[in-house]
């Protein structure tokens, strides 16, 4: 499917998906409080976004257990994480950013670049499997 045919997710939705994936990947509960801490937002603001993500088919909310990504949610989260890692690697290897600079810059760029650009950057980098932080 072409980039232009995909639903454009807001940076906020992408950050939530990435945050939920990160929490559940480590084996932690993706509770509203854990998610609020991970994203640096107030717990009260989490509820509305969880409902939105559930409506979009990206998460399932399990009462008293927290949030789990659906298959589609996991696919999107991994796509976003891949974008971030390719950007970090490109910024460091090709543009001379320091290790401490790449994360914040990649956080800004990951929401603004196309899948096509990420694919081309990854190709130039010989499809890296790890980011500059070793992840």
Enumerate the predicted regions with their spans:
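Extreme N-terminal segment that seeds HTH/winged-HTH DNA-binding domains in transcriptional regulators
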Residues: 1-40
